[in-house]
A protein has these predicted regions:
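Short acidic, Pro/Gly- and aromatic-enriched capping/linker segments at domain boundaries
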Residues: 145-147, 151-156
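Metal-dependent DNA phosphodiester-chemistry modules and their immediately adjacent helices/loops
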Residues: 111, 161-166
């Protein structure tokens, strides 16, 4: 039997504000997030808080797929390798989120959390609340060396929809709260 890790917890708070906490971006996270969003919508959600505090990141495809449930049409994130080759991940805008949105972050929100909060901030569809994020704006790959060890290599840097690099800087909150 496979045990599915719960990476998403959610509830309806007072005043019909939905709350979704995402602990990491795992392969199972997209489906859990989509289910949470749909359930909160059914309950009459008037606004949404997405909590990415202490979320170290995770799967690149998972975070971009989750953002496709929220963002308008356009670029979600782009990556640039050392040769200067740029790849863009785009969104068709079919599910654009049109209610008040806040994304909670702190100094331990990293990598995929920064792709998420950076995109929300660049499109202006929500407020980023908390502390400046970690600043891990690189794509890394593990290379198996065949002897039980592996090498982690940085293969590209990623940029927010407006072309901002997060690496070493992080995403600054719109509203700073400790």
């Amino acid at each position: 039997d496979k045990i599915e890790v719960q990476t998403v917890a959610y509830e309806m708070k007072e005043d019909q504000i939905g709350y979704i906490a995402v602990s990491e971006f795992d392969s199972v996270t997209y489906h859990q997030f989509e289910t949470a969003l749909e359930d909160l919508e059914k309950q009459g959600m008037k606004g949404l808080v997405i909590d990415l505090r202490n979320n170290p990141g995770g799967n690149f495809d998972t975070v971009t797929d989750m953002l496709k449930l929220l963002l308008p049409e356009g670029v979600i994130v782009s990556t640039k390798d050392k040769e200067g080759n740029v790849e863009e991940v785009t969104c068709d805008g079919a599910n654009e989120f049109d209610k008040p949105l806040a994304v909670l972050v702190n100094q331990y929100s990293a990598s995929a959390s920064e792709i998420f909060s950076g995109a929300v901030q660049d499109y202006g569809i929500g407020e980023i609340v908390g502390m400046t994020t970690y600043g891990k704006g690189v794509v890394q790959q593990l290379m198996d060396l065949g002897d039980g060890t592996c090498l982690k290599m940085t293969i590209a840097e990623y940029y927010t929809p407006n072309g901002r690099s997060i690496n070493g800087k992080g995403v600054e909150p719109d509203v700073e709260v400790e």
